[in-house]
Amino acid sequence: MKIITCFKLVPEEQDIVVTPEYTLNFDNADAKISQFDLNAIEAASQLATDDDEIAALTVGGSLLQNSKVRKDVLSRGPHSLYLVQDAQLEHALPLDTAKALAAAIEKIGFDLLIFGEGSGDLYAQQVGLLVGEILQLPVINAVSAIQRQGNTLVIERTLEDDVEVIELSVPAVLCVTSDINVPRIPSMKAILGAGKKPVNQWQASDIDWSQSAPLAELVGIRVPPQTERKHIIIDNDSPEAIAELAEHLKKALN
């Protein structure tokens, strides 16, 4: 079985700076694998047998040049890495991202596609579903467990009140939640071995992808202004204290 696990590179949250204008400055933010996609990579590694092949795939802009992140991906189980880099994919919305991934996936060849439920930055939860639609494949999201029985997969979806169990044949698309596993920390041997694994770097023209006419435009991302706290503490439940609390709430709402 050939498994492709798709991932997104996102900025390191602790390095993002909020400017006085409430915009976000990413200048000093290093790239990292989106946390939800670490679960997808781990799920692929746990599912694969010795005879299977795992390929990791991502599309994007300048963040893909980060050699540290490339090694991190390959140290987590994939046998090869595919990168599609184009300036137009730097801030692509889900539909364009999905079209680029689908084109690359068809060129690579696959049996099973595994995505994280959403990305660690926007968490739109759309890309995996859109790729399945573009490729006309069955798609299951909210996947919390995967078992393998030959070429049949037994999938669990943990819902609000129950757990669905679904049998599925490949080819298919799975979007896994963070509950499916705890991603392992790569061993030193795996990190050293990652440098010997193949990295395939493509441009948009290599997969016949071009940006579509936008149905929506990402104008910007802003942080909501923080409300100054009043620092009023009421530490008892006497009638007087309750009346005081009510008075403070009235003032805050008016």
Swiss-Prot record:
Pfam families attached to this UniProt entry: ETF
Transmembrane segments: none
UniProt keywords, alphabetically: Electron transport, FAD, Flavoprotein, Transport
Keyword Flavoprotein: yes
Recorded superkingdom: Bacteria
InterPro entries with a match to the protein in the record: ET-Flavoprotein_bsu_CS, ETF_a/b_N, ETF_b, ETF_beta_N, Rossmann-like_a/b/a_fold
Keyword Glycoprotein: no
Gene3D superfamilies referenced in this protein's UniProt entry, alphabetically: HUPs (3.40.50.620)
GO biological process: DNA damage response
GO molecular function per UniProt: electron transfer activity
SUPFAM superfamilies, per the entry: Adenine nucleotide alpha hydrolases-like (SSF52402)
Assembly behavior: YdiR and YdiQ form a heterodimer.
Similarity comment: Belongs to the ETF beta-subunit/FixA family.
Function comment: May play a role in a redox process.
Protein name listed in UniProt: Putative electron transfer flavoprotein subunit YdiQ
Organism, scientific name: Escherichia coli (strain K12)
